[in-house]
Amino acid sequence: MPRHRVNEPNRRFHDRVAAKYDKIYDDPFWEFHDRITWNHLKPFLPRDATAAVMDLGCGTGKWGLKLLKGGYPTTFTDLSAKMLDEVQKKLDVWKEQPDLAGKVAKATVQEADAVDLRAFPESHFSLVTAMGDVVSICSDPGRCLSEVHRLLAPGGIFVFTVDNHLAAIDHFIAAGNLEALAAFVKSGKTEWLTKNVAEQFDVHMFTPGQIDSLVRAKGFEVVSRIGKMIIPARQNKKLFETERALEVLIDLETRLQSEPTAAARASHLQLAVRKAT
């Protein structure tokens, strides 16, 4: 499959960080984050354990491996070949474990760009996930949604995250650059924060209303949308030091998610959308 030159900075960055990616996200905050993510995703798992699922922009395979462990035939795909190497290493470890070895045969690992999924069959998947803001950081969010729509079976579910436009305003305020703030508010577009110019790529941010409108325009019905993380616990690790801190924070975050306007202060938005039957 031909590579899209516009996506090379994205690929370069993720190739470079692949080997240390899991360590970057190994702390109590990310455990909190991942529990919230899974709690929202879990109700949309296919009831049929033979249903095909895809982890799009899978990175090192965190969510795809959970799906595979649940028995689903799982396709892991990412723009970065180095990220897929990390997935394959984990699958190789699974082969040595009697309780997991049989599930490895249900895994497919294949490089692909989120805006070009021609390599995969139409109307084949019951569930596609795209965590890590794949829709935000790909070169064309609308095209990505169209590609996923083509891959999903009628009634299939796409669960994904995007960066929240409203939450990013504080970054531009802190920088004190009025021109940059105005450009961002008007476009919802910024650049990946990395010092290496060769690794800088566009990031598309969305308000709740904007992402709802885009998915509907691409033929999806919005089933559920939450803001996360509404509680900015990453800013103070002391919150995790008390007994049962994780469970308390999960309960509070979940309570806040029931208030639709709370999404305005969340760093990300997570949606479950359905392809019409």
Regions found by a protein language model. Give the residues of each.
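Conserved class I S-adenosyl-L-methionine
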Residues: 1-48, 62, 66, 157-188
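Class I SAM-dependent methyltransferase SAM/SAH-binding core
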Residues: 54, 60-116
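A short SAM/SAH-binding and catalytic strip from SAM-dependent methyltransferases
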Residues: 126-140
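A short glycine-rich, Lys/Arg-flanked "PGG" loop and its adjoining helix->strand segment in the class I
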Residues: 142-157
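Acceptor-substrate binding/catalytic loop of class I
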Residues: 195-210
